[in-house]
């Protein structure tokens, strides 16, 4: 189960680790779309709206759990790189204890807040009951979502990105089958979609636990490893909490941008919604690079090989930025046809084309600052990732979207460029932070 990422070709390790991670992200995207697609075949608009609103809430929650779990990936990865099996076991056991307690506490809170959350999302009255039912059932599955992401983080910290891909593939297949059963055959509506999702997560967790117990070359856990240790849990949270907060606040910012677009009218709102879906798919590459740099960088830092960790960063930036430049050039020529894949409304296509041409530049800049974020996590400085992302959101993304929407009512192009400008600011902050850390000799955990 454990894979040594501290030897051999750096670029080869990046490719071998990132491709399963990329496919995992793709499957998670497919997993999230399945409920919406299937209920659209069997339910009315209120049912579709309920699942749409509920899935947005669950997407934000899942991203925050994944961000929090980054603390486990990095700390376990550093221990594995240092060949310290006892420390790796201690971090693994404490991670499981910590997240079990947190998930149970959060589940109780979310169940009590299901209806207020649906209200905050401005859910239409016709879809309110379905949305609340969807959220309550999905909230019951929060411990399962947490368990899957923790197990996946443990595997990735060990250098294995393939098994988490298999686990999400199992969940995706089971979810689709159960959706057709509960929504199509049993006509359970949004509640059926939520039940299918939750049971699919349960199956995935069961499979992942079975694999974890039977895998050779893994971490041997003892009862003492699960006993809470303040220093261990504190380090996991110091890395994970900034990433979780960052991901949650970024999603809130995107909701603000959606509100701004909605105020421009139905056509522009539809165009922005479609382009966001396209961009979220293209961002799978930068996202996989972030996670790859975190895992590979952590192992190499733990092994006392900071030069290899830096090489991982530079190679990943080259891949992500190269992809961004390529896709940005292509989109300049095919923006309208790409938008037209999602709608036959000529007005929406005409509005979405310019927005996509501006927004697509974000792929170039995001590819760079995502990789820096992964590196900052690997060296235990995830607060830097939080700072540059939130600064960009507060100073550029949201105000830029508002101002361009107000002063350029005839086109969405400036609004798309405002988003890319936010990522450019993030890149500038990341480069400055990196240079400052290097000048003061703080590119290793605990230095300075």
Question: What is each of the regions a protein language model found here?
Answer:
Residues 1-18, 76-143, 185-241, 297-362, ...:
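Short alpha-helical transmembrane segments in multi-pass integral membrane proteins
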Residues 16-35, 137, 171, 200-204, ...:
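Transmembrane helical elements of multi-pass membrane transporters/channels
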Residues 21, 25, 37, 74, ...:
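Transmembrane alpha-helix boundary and packing residues in multipass membrane permease domains
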Residues 22, 26, 30, 34, ...:
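Generic alpha-helical transmembrane segments of integral inner-membrane proteins
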